[in-house]
Every structure is written in structure tokens, then in C-alpha cells.
Amino acid sequence: MRNQTFIIVGAGQAGAMAAATLRQQQFDGDIILIGKEYHAPYERPILSKDYLINPEEAPKYLFSEDFYLEKQIDLRIGQLVSQIMPSKHCVVLENGGKLRYDKLLLTMGARARRFPLLDQLGENIYTLRTLDDAQRLRQAVKKDKRILIVGGGVIGLELAATSCELGANVTVIEQADNIMGRCAPPLLQDYLLNRHQEKGVQFFLDTNIVSAQKQGSELVLILNTGEKVIGDIIIYGIGAEFRDQLAADAGLVTDGGIVIDSRCQTSEPDIFAAGDVCLQREPLTGDLQRRETWENANRQATIAAHAMMGLAPPQPGAPWFWTDQWGINIQMVGNMQAEEWHIQGDLQSDKAILFGTENEVLVGAVAINQGREMRNLRKLLANPAQVVSGVEWA
């Protein structure tokens, strides 16, 4: 493969890990890694936590500058690909330049879904997806500020905890009647809601914003309940818009994301995709699934790199992710939509394991401040046929 060129569009977690994996697997052709941001690839999980809390915290880059030089990875930051031409095996840069590829990997990720009702307020409206976003938030979140967080997902709750730790007064507004509804079982939702409320976070659940106004320096939201909430800053996280337009324009199959198979291959044989931008077909159900997690970006990057080289990909494990809120580490593995959940340990002491089962089969688990147990749980859930009939949970 010495004379081949592999191009990776998107220099985030998946893109950088794919480039590293290609070199690890002895790919000796050219690798070009193109990123829109003016930063080398960096870790995103810390942006809603340590990076905001500690003003001295530096960005955590995935690899050093020397790494890209030593591995002969051509990292091009601050560049944008404007077109893919599959029939000619080339990409067109925004400046008009063209680059030919033998294999192409798309890892463009996602952007924050916009909320025009809030955006029209102008200043002091924030989202969090990038390092630049985090740098702006770091300057805004201060002691005694009134912060309105719109969206009760993982990022919203992490920001709520972080903002409170910085001394701010925090209110969370969520359209659903629960928090973390897309990714957490009801037991965990209730547990986290209680912990946040104990720390002083105010919640408006099952609530919509019907009006948003700026009155002097204050931001005023009118809710469908008729209540009014006032803040100095609004941070919203209401989902993501996936950067699949480039692929759609090139004729690739998309469906609110780039559709890939188990090898991360798109509808074009020499084009692959990985990370948040993808929808992958589940082998058992045939359903298209998206997992917007750090672990999934790494896993798909590894699979895609192997597939691009014609190598057998590693076996995927059960999906896993984590969140840290109020000093509590919560790790989740497997299916969070299980029919039944069982508690082992004591939630009140912030140390427990939740086991999710369907038809007496273990399909998911949540470890609360039980990180040492997660390795075994991940191994256990890699085998979907573990029968748990007769297990004593308490």
C-alpha cells in the first residue's frame, strides 16, 4: 500500500484515532488528516467538566505535535473540504485545491442543533461542542451568575454540576418529563435528579419555552406553564445536527447521518465513515443506530482503519460510555432500555450497580462509583447470552 493515499475528513476523536490505527497496523502509504477547526485533535469529554472548573487546565490533545511528524501523518488544520467526487476519487478543498485518494474516511462529527428563539437574543447565549465553545463558556460562567440550561441530557447535566461548583445559580429546563431520557434507565434518572436538586439545581421538566426576551442585561424565558425564569446566561443543548451534507451531495446514502455497514463502509466502496456523523445498521434488528460517544468514535475509527486496509476488524464490544457529575462517576454499558432493572448496593451512598435484564438475560449495566467492576461488566455483556435466572441482586 506504499503508493496509496488515504484521506480523512474531520480531525476529531474518530479521525485522529483512525490515522493512528492505520500506522499501528503498518499502513505505509500517505495519510492526510483534514480538520475544519484551528486546533489539533483534542479530547472533548473534559470540556464540560475539568476544563471549565480549572482556569489553568490546558486542552488535552489526543497526540503531541511530534506524533504526527513521527508517524508521517499530514495534519491540515483550519481547512475545509467543500466537495467529494467519488467517480474521480478526489476531494475539493474550499480554496479550490484538489486531493486524490485511494480510500476516504469521513469523520466530520456533528454541530449543536440551533435554537433560533434563543439565538435571536444575541449575547450570552452559548452551546458546547468545541474547544472554542468551552473557552467562551470559561469566561462566562462565574460565581453568582444565574445560568439557565436548556436541555437535560448528559452535557446539560454536566454543565449544571460544573456551573454550581463554580458558584453559579442554575436552572435546568427540559422538554421531556425526565432527565437523560435517551441514555439512562429510570432508576438512574431519578437518582441523578435527586442529587442535582440536593445541590440546589432547580428543574422545570415536561416544559417548553414559548417566549424569550432580553430586558436590559437580563434574559427572560416564558414557559408554557406561564412561569417566568430570569437568567444572566443561557446554555442550550437540544441535540445535534450531523454533518452529512458533504456525503449527501456526493450521492452517498444518508438518513440523518451517513449510513454505514458493520465495516464502516458507505454506499461507495472506497468511502468509509466513523463517529457521530454515522448511522450503523444493527446486525440483529436491521435498525439504524447512532451512538454519540467517545468510545463509539474510537471503536468505529479502529474498525474503519482495518477495513480500509482490507484487514479483519476487531470484534466490537457492548456500547459503553460514562459521565461525571458532582464527583460521582457513572459508567453505562449495554442496553439502557432494558425491561427490568435491579439494584446491587446502595444508591444513597453513591455506590451501586444497576443490572438491566430482558427475559432473565443480562443486557445492560450501570456502575455508580464502581469503576473497578466495569471491566468485568463489559466482558460479561460482550456475550449477549448470559442467563441470570436466580441471581440475588440485593
From Swiss-Prot:
Its EC number is 1.18.1.3. Belongs to the bacterial ring-hydroxylating dioxygenase ferredoxin reductase family. The lineage of its organism: Bacteria, Pseudomonadati, Pseudomonadota, Gammaproteobacteria, Enterobacterales. The keyword Flavoprotein applies. GO terms for molecular function: 3-phenylpropionate dioxygenase activity; ferredoxin-NAD+ reductase activity; oxidoreductase activity, acting on NAD(P)H. FAD binds at residues 5-36. Part of the multicomponent 3-phenylpropionate dioxygenase, that converts 3-phenylpropionic acid (PP) and cinnamic acid (CI) into 3-phenylpropionate-dihydrodiol (PP-dihydrodiol) and cinnamic acid-dihydrodiol (CI-dihydrodiol), respectively. It catalyses: 2 reduced [2Fe-2S]-[ferredoxin] + NAD(+) + H(+) = 2 oxidized [2Fe-2S]-[ferredoxin] + NADH. This is 3-phenylpropionate/cinnamic acid dioxygenase ferredoxin--NAD(+) reductase component. GO terms for cellular component: cytoplasm. Its cofactor is FAD. The gene is hcaD. This dioxygenase system consists of four proteins: the two subunits of the hydroxylase component (HcaE and HcaF), a ferredoxin (HcaC) and a ferredoxin reductase (HcaD). NAD(+) binds at residues 146-174.
